[in-house]
Structure formats: C-alpha cells, structure tokens
Amino acid sequence: MIKRVHLGQGRADEILDLPNLIEIQLNSYEKFLQLDKLKNKKPLLNEGLESVFRNIFPIKSGNGDVALEYERYYIENDALNFTEKECKRKGQSYEAVLKVRLNLQFLTTGEIRQKDVYMGTIPLMTERGTFIINGAERVVVSQIHRSPGVVFYKEKDLYSARIIPYRGSWLEFEIDSKKDYLYVKIDRKKRILITLFLRALGFDTREKIIETFYNIKKIKVEDSTKRDLPGQYLAKSINIRENMYYRAGDKITLQDVEDFLQNGVNEIELVDFDGYDAISGKCFVSSNVILNCLEKEDAFFALKDGSKELPKESVMLAVYGALFPGEPISIDNAENDLKTIFFSERRYDLGRVGRYKLSKKFGFDDLSTSVLTMYDIVNTISHLLRIYEGHDILDDIDHLGNRRVRSVGELLTNIYKGAMSRVEKIAKDRMSNKEVFNLKPQELISVKPIVSAVKEFFATSQLSQFMDQVNPLAELTHKRRLNALGPGGLSRDRAGFEVRDVHYTHYGRMCPIETPEGPNIGLIVSLATYSRVNDYGFLETPYRKVVNGEVTDELEYLSAIDEEKKCIAQANAAFNSNGKYLEDLVSVRISGDYTTTNPKNIDYMDVSPRQLISVSSALIPFLEHNDANRALMGSNMQRQAVPLLFPKPPIVGTGMESVVAKDSGVVVKAKRSGEVILATSSKIVVKPFESENAKDLDEYHIVKYERTNQDTCFNQSVLVKEGQKVESGEIIADGPATRYGELALGNNLLLGVIPWNGFNYEDAILISDRIVKEDLYTSIHIKEFSIEVRETKLGPEKVTGDIPNVSEKILNKLDENGIIRIGTYVKPGDILVGKVTPKSEGDITPEFRLLTSIFGEKAKDVKNNSLKVPHGTEGTVIDVQRITKEDVGNLSPGVEEILKVYVAKKRKLKEGDKMAGRHGNKGVVAKILPVEDMPYLADGTPLDICLNPLGVPSRMNIGQLMESQLGLAGKYLGESYNVPVFESATNEQIQEKLKKAGFNPTSKEILYDGYTGEPFENEVMVGVIYMLKLHHLVDDKMHARSTGPYSLVSQQPLGGKAQFGGQRLGEMEVWALEAYGAAHTLQELLTVKSDDMSGRVKIYENIVKGVPTNVSGIPESFNVLMQELRGLGLDLSIYDDNGNQVPLTEKEEELINKG
C-alpha cells in the first residue's frame, strides 16, 4: 500500500467507515433467496421467494376436495453444472436448480402425496454482485419509482388525492375548485360523485355521511335563536309527520324554523363549520363541498323534495355503470365486485410500504392489514378537504419520502409472483380433471411460465443490463446505479424538469453530481457514498446524534421522512474533545432551508463531508473548486478510462482510491490471516495461522489476460512473495486499473499550461514522445470472434484447412484442423477458422457427372464460409476455445460446435485518442512531439503534456490547477496526498509544499522552447496532473472503404463503420464542387462511385486493363424514380438525340433488341 499524507482542513480519521459499496446488490439478493439460512438450515423469513410461495399455496380445487400445500424450497447448490469461470468460457448461465417440496392432500380420504417438484433454474449472484447470463456478466440495476401510499397534489384548478397500491386499482379523489364538488375516479375511468361512492361502500344515509366528516352542534329552537338558523345545514333528519320531513344536509329556511316552533321541535342538530372540536381534539371539515355533493345528488337523480333517501339500486347502477360500462348489473354482484376491488387481498395489496405510508400520514398504528379500510378512505377525503380549505399543505411528489428503491430481490419477487399466479391457474384447471385422484404433485405444476418469466427478465428487461466493465470504477458505479426508467417507472419523453432536478432530500442519499448528460439526465442517478436502502425501500443516510448541544458518537440512519423538520449541522462544524460546539452560531439545514442556530437546537450532525456525493465524484480532488457541470463530466469520464499496462495511482488522491479497489471485486483479498507458501503468476496458496490441519490451505487463482464486456483486458498481478505473512482482508493481487491495492486509472504527467504552435487549440492536447516510448498509456484490448458449425440440409459443415480457392500463404497460418495457431499475428482478411459448407448440387450437366465419376468426391462443390478477421482489426491470437455438445449439453438447435478466437492488440497512445483529467478537462491528442522539441524547465526536464490555458477560465474547473500545483510538490518531495472532498488543502498549504520542493509558490516557472532553446516570454504555470486515456480510441473510429456493400433498392453504398459503408456526399458537398467547377469529379462521385451499376463494372474492368476511361451510365436512383412514376400509371420512355429508345433495365434491352 502507498503511504499517503493527509492534507486538508478536516480531521484525518472518520467516525464511520464506508460500508461495503455493493451491499445494495448483495443484501437485496440475500433477502430474496435467503441462501445463508438455507445453508445453515434455519427457518426462512416470510420475504422474497418464500413469501411468493406462501401467498400462492395452498392451491385448492373448485370443490375443495384436493389441496396442494407448500412445505419448503431448497436450492441445489452442489449440483451446479459449471463454475463462474466455465460459464463465461462456454457461454452458459451461472444458475442453480430450484426445487419445492409440495404435499398433495386429498381431503376426502386424508391421503397425502409428497414430492420435491422441479421449479426451473434460478440465476445465482456472484460475490461481485453480478449475474452471468449466457456467458456475459450482467447487472440488475435498482429502480427508483413512486412509492405506494397516498399523495396529495394540485394540477391547475384541481386538488387531488391519489391512493397508489403496490398491486391493484388506483383510487383518485379530486375537488373541482370552480364548482366545489368532490369526485372519485377508479383506475382513471369515469368520475363518480363522492357521496354516491360512499353510499355504495355502506354510508347509506345522509346522516352517516355528514357525521363522518363534520362536527355537529346542538341548538335550541326558540325565539332568541330564530334569526340565526336560516341558511344553516341540518345534521340530523327531522320527521314531524308524513308530509313534513326535513333531511340531513338540507339548508334551513325561515319557514322551516316556523314549522319547528309550531310542531314542538325544541332542539335540532346542525353542521358546525368550525373544523376543530376542542373536547375531542379532532379536526373536521369546514367547507360545504360534501353538502354540495349531496345537493347535486338530487339533481342527478331528479329527486323531488321530501324523498327520504336514494334507493340502493340507483346508487349501485350509477357507480357500477361508471366502472364497468355496458356490463349487465345485478345489485348483489355489483356490491361484491366493488368490495373485492379494494377490500380483497387477492385483488388489492397496499404492500408493507403503502400501509406504512398511510399509517405515517394518518397516525394509524395497525401495520398488519395490506388492503384498504374505510378508515383510509375517510381520512384521505378529510385530509384532501382540509388542504382545499387551507388548513393542511400539499405533498411534494419529488420528495424522497414519496419515491422508493426496488432492488434486484424485489424485482425478482415480482417476476416470480406474476409467474406463480399463472402456475396456480394451470394447477386449478388440472385439478378440475376427473382423474385428479391418480395425479402426483409434479403433474399439477407447470414449470414453463416460471422458466420463461425468469429468462425474459434476465435477458431482455430494461433493468437487467450488460455490465459496464471498462474499469473497476465503471463496474462499481453500475451496481450502485438508480434508474427511474423501466417497467412501472417513468419514460424519457414524459419525464418533466421537476422529477430530474436535484431535491433537498437527495442530500446524503443520491448524488447531485453524477448523472448522464443526454436525454437521461436526472433519471439515472447514483447512490451517495454512505447511503443504504431500508426495509421499506426508502433511502437512508447516517447522522451523529447531538444531545443538548453536544456531539455524541451515536449513529442513526434517517430516511427522508424521518429527517423532515430536523435540525442538522454540517460535518466540518468545529467542536472540542467533549463534543461541545466552539461557535455560538452553527450552520445548519432544516428541510432544505440553510440557516444558523444555537447548538442547543441541533438534533443531528453529518458524519462526513463526502456524505452527499457518489463514489465517482468523491474521487475528484478539489471538487469544491469546480463548476458542477464539469464535475459531472469528470465523474462520468473516470468510468470510461481504459485500464493501462503500467498505471500509477494519483499523487493527489482523495482517500477513496483504496476503498474503490477493495470493494470493486477486481482485486484478490486474503480470506484468512496466514503465510504465503506459493506465489506464481497464476496461483497464490496461503497456509492460515488458525488451522492446524496441514491440508487446510487457501488457494487463490489469478486471472490472466481475460476479455471484459467492453473488450478491455482483465489481468491480475500478484503482490506477495513466498514466505510473506498476510492479514485477513489484505490485498494480495492487483486487478486491472489498480496498483498496490489502490485505484489507478491513469498516470501522473508533468504539465505546462501553455499554447504551443496551435497544436492545443480548442482543447487539443500536445503530448511528449516519451509517454509513447515508455508505454505510459499503452493498453491491451481483446476481441472475441466466434463461428458456429452447423448441420445443414445438405450435410454437416466442416472445420478444415482444405479450403477451395485460397492461397497457400493464408493457409500456412492454420493448424492441421484449420484453426489459427495461438501466437499468430493476424491482419484484416486473414482466416481464423477454416470452414466449408456443402453447396446445393442443382442441375448437374452430363460433363460434370463425367468429372465426378472420374475424380470421385473431390469435385463435389463446397462453399468457403470461413471466419475472417474483419476490416480495421489486427493483433495476436491469444486463445482458441472449442465448445461442443459434450462440453455444454445444450447448444442451439442445429449447432454442432462453436469456435471462439480471442485476438489481443496492444494499443499505444496515438493522435486522435481522447484523454481527460478528473475535472471534466477533456481533449483529443493532436500531436505527439519528440522529447527534444517539447518545452523544458530550467533544469532541462522536458514537459510531458501541454494544455491550453483557455480551457480553464470559461469552464470554471479550477480544481485542475490546484491538483497540478500540489502534484508538482508531491512529485519532487516523493509524497502522495489524501485531499478529501470539501476538506481540501488550502492555498497556503499548497504553497508551503511548493516552497519545500524548491518551486515558486505560484508554481510558475520559466520554460524554454525545445526548438530554439530560448526562454518563453512569460513565466508558465507548471504542475503534475493525473490524466486518463478514455475508451474512445482512434483505432475504433478510423474507417475507410474502396468498394463494399450497396443498398438493395437505391444501389448506393451503405453508411457507417459497422456496415463497412462509405462517406456521405450530401447536397452541400455537391454545391462546393459545383462552385469549383469540378464537373468531371462531381459526375464521377454521383454516378460510378455511387449507384451507376453498369458504370461501376466497366470502370473496374478499365482500371484492371489499364485503359483510359470515361464511362457514364444511368444512375440507379433515376431508375427508382422511373419505377415510382410508373407506379403512378405514367408510362415513361427515354430516347437519345437520334430518337432511339434508351433501355433502363436488361429486360427492356432485350425487348428493344427483339423489336
């Protein structure tokens, strides 16, 4: 390990170590599969896969005679067909068999038949948090989506409340503020008046509805109150006699008051619009929205005054008709259907999260019910009305209390739920069979729905992604990514600005910096460094507890809901050894407001300044001196850095480098403390101290030169020697882009910030030849080429070195089996695997039959279908894999064998390669200059790199200058530094180090021109900067073509490197050539070089023969136009100057010649 000097304003020690950075993946999958509990034979918790089986079983037959009951499941871990390494090599999936013990119970006879039923295979997660599917490593990205529960919001003039379940129908309430009516919508169907909906749910009288929402007051009816009563609403109906009935909810008139007095009504109950009851402490509704709805009912059903209540039939007809238009209605069925929509566990599930959110909102303690209750509906309506009246506030839908994370375990649980419901349906159908008593448990279960659902999820789901494996940081970030897209999430086109924006609840939970730059900005984000996901799926971040103004070492994880209204101090707030704050006023934040307060008011304190950003951003030194846009680019570009042959860790680091290397899974860590007894390039053996058994050894296999998903090189190198003692958890072998157990994505270069003859104009980069000669930025890239050997209708294809019409020179590189030899250097067009396919014989002529009879089988025709090296690729063959049916057991239908050839290429730094620093300072290498021509320092040291000073001011990424200054001091003092983010070294500290190293405190030095030896006019800033080579290499982008494939209809060359296409000559290029008057060049470009088919052939003949040429035919695009016009019914013919018809096609030519 490298000894680093802590240089910054904060404390070197942290109160809380960083968690395992991929625990979000590992913990979620362990919760789903509970492998540890299965191994140790412990009882399983009712979550993940276990909860799916418990919810589906028992499955009972229609008549209740037969029941299929679930006992337990187990994973056949010992019966794994292939190891992880073999799966990658053979293109297989790393998975285990899932078996479920089922009991088929015959309730009439009491007989029980038990069987362990095969339930398909289930992919297993590797220690690195990835899955291996069809030989490729994949990551299931966590999805951030809208949390189930209740949410209150406003759109235009509509105040709305929405109850979102985990599974089931959405229930929406909305108040039309213009008309003062409250409606309900189920699954966004036609809206229903709220009072009708309540009546359908059992609030069948006006009195019940009023007493549910309003406070009620009793008033004596006497002469003194006579004037106050008109205009008020009755809360209870009054029945004086048959023709004198006063309904609850009706407005009292003066005449009504007179009737009360005359008929001896002494006391009446009225609606009290004062929304607070002082005795019970309850809040009630204070607007007349519900009363308006009762009034609207009368108009809706055209009720005459004096009618007592709405008939139940009318209510059910109205509600059911809105929900299921056009369906026949029976009242009992309608009532049952309505109840099952919300109150049946099979149709509706709020989920643990939904129930938790509703309970938090309405102060309801029972967390056991997962269906909706009347209490929930009434509370939602009351709360919405109170918001409408201005007594409560709306919810913020972008608050992290309203968004939650679905990790891999939960996503898979949902997949299994859907598949098992189909299995249940099939089992019930099979149970209805008359022969049910002869059945066995396995005959009732159909595995197909499960197998296809799991396969589809891992292979095609938007959330199961091909792992970004360019370097260890890219891997780690991919596993910590949060995606708002995908099934049940947002879509790119409909996501607005608000949902993409940074929110104050993201602090310590989601990184405000790291996100893509394109259309996915803000929709794909990263977890913050200390963040974790709690049991409900909400993101939590740790804080230190502050008690009576004193900081304690007690830690507490808070979700965004818990953190609301809490007073939180920053991590760098100064306090003494007893935890007392040194300042009388401390900077704090309270729900997104930043202010200062007395230490006594503080509840919590941040654990670390890097708490709010992601791992990638925390690797950028002096981050706080950079503009946010450039920090975003810096975070993203570190993930694109290619692993180099000889990388070095940065002189100026942040302290995160070793953590990233350790948790990324690319390095080898010692499992137990012990002594190294064997260390070779491919294997390390450690004898543990704790074990007495001489055979109990820890073996570690070292990966050498393997291809990653992105064609970069995965290579591990041993760090220990035989006889060395190692501690548990110590890094004993480096991986790609790591050095001495630290992340090392690039190299430290001596920098001069100076323009040089225009070669670093517009972000271009000038590089010294020394960098290329010393292989500082040389990387290895490995490409895989594969070919299938198939069984065809005409016979099997053959892998052979006996290929027709191929020169001996090319065949010399193949071995006796027709496969390229390992170690051969191959170029475009070389054969990697010789393969011949039988040709169809067609109609054999007598002459050919004679030849066959003379020469035997040899004359039988075969087609050359060999695997060749594509254009633009060359390199050394490092491995050949042959995968047969015997190896794998299940190749695709018709495939006999698969051959894979791996070609490695060493790529040095070239002009056109993209390079970048860690601060978003990117550019393309414009010139590689000989060392002697580079500007040099007074002691003769030539610079490694020259960057343009104009790249700094407008980009506002000053961090690169500070890094360069400190890097310069570090290089000459032989020190490496830890400069944590938001606690960086000050200018004074940097200047002190520069002085100590013997440099000017400004780090400006006199530079000398390498051409003339003369000093430059002004002093130039010199430093040491950490630069990366990015995965945008000129070799992959450079492309040229002579002849190649043409489009079928237009006969013009295809476009793009992948299609081996040509360059497009557009109309603007035509104008340019017209302006020059280059008529012949233009004609050639538009005809023979494009789509003049006959002209192409003739000009090729002429070039081969060496004859001067001036061919011009008719371009195919003209023929296409002609055919289009003929399609419109216009018969067009073309004639030359002599009146002779010009043929456009071969057929026309024949017709003209005949005519």
Swiss-Prot record:
Q: Which domain of life is it from?
A: Bacteria
List the GO molecular function terms: DNA binding; DNA-directed RNA polymerase activity; ribonucleoside binding
Gene3D superfamilies attached to this UniProt entry: 2.40.50.100, 2.40.50.150, 3.90.1100.10, DNA-directed RNA polymerase, beta subunit, external 1 domain (2.30.150.10), DNA-directed RNA polymerase, subunit 2, domain 6 (2.40.270.10), RNA polymerase alpha subunit dimerisation domain (3.90.1800.10), RNA polymerase Rpb2, domain 2 (3.90.1110.10)
Q: Which GO terms describe its cellular component?
A: DNA-directed RNA polymerase complex
Q: Which UniProt keywords apply?
A: DNA-directed RNA polymerase, Nucleotidyltransferase, Transcription, Transferase
Family to which this protein belongs: Belongs to the RNA polymerase beta chain family.
Question: In UniProt terms, what function does this protein have?
Answer: DNA-dependent RNA polymerase catalyzes the transcription of DNA into RNA using the four ribonucleoside triphosphates as substrates.
Its subunit composition reads: The RNAP catalytic core consists of 2 alpha, 1 beta, 1 beta' and 1 omega subunit. When a sigma factor is associated with the core the holoenzyme is formed, which can initiate transcription.
Q: What is this protein called?
A: DNA-directed RNA polymerase subunit beta
